A protein has these predicted regions:
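A short helix-loop-beta-strand connector motif used in the catalytic cores of GNAT acetyltransferases and
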Residues: 1-12
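Acyl-donor (CoA/ACP) binding surface of acyl/acetyltransferases
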Residues: 10, 15-116
């Protein structure tokens, strides 16, 4: 049986003016496998398409993998969300598979510590 650390860690995403526009979080921490899931939400629509998401994901991934004893971070994004997939690729994440959940197809992506 595998146990995961359900505690999540959140980081605020701010624009150049210091206004909070979203969050990056990691969760589903599995120390035995050396991995955690990472996600992002940029809620301020006027901040979309300006690179905040990819910059925040790249910064968070590098920070987490250099300060927490993990080998990789992974994420899931809906297969039709090509905008998010491009942002994650720009941040250094690489697609490695797909999965289905509740009738939806997800693209699986990862960022490994050895890529730092």
């Amino acid at each position: 049986m595998r146990y995961t650390d359900m505690a999540a860690r959140y980081f605020a995403v701010e624009d150049e003016g210091g206004h909070r526009i979203g969050n990056v979080m990691y969760y589903n921490l599995d120390r035995s496998r050396g991995e955690a899931e990472i996600g992002i939400s940029i809620g301020a629509r006027d901040a979309w398409g300006k690179g905040y998401g990819s910059d925040a994901m790249r910064t968070a991934a590098r920070y987490v993998l250099s300060t927490v004893d993990l080998k990789r971070l992974y994420l899931r994004t809906l297969d039709w969300n090509e905008r998010a997939q491009r942002a994650f690729q720009k941040a250094g994440f690489v697609a490695y598979g797909s999965s289905f959940r509740e009738g939806h197809k997800f693209i699986l992506m990862e960022f490994r510590r050895e890529w730092l």
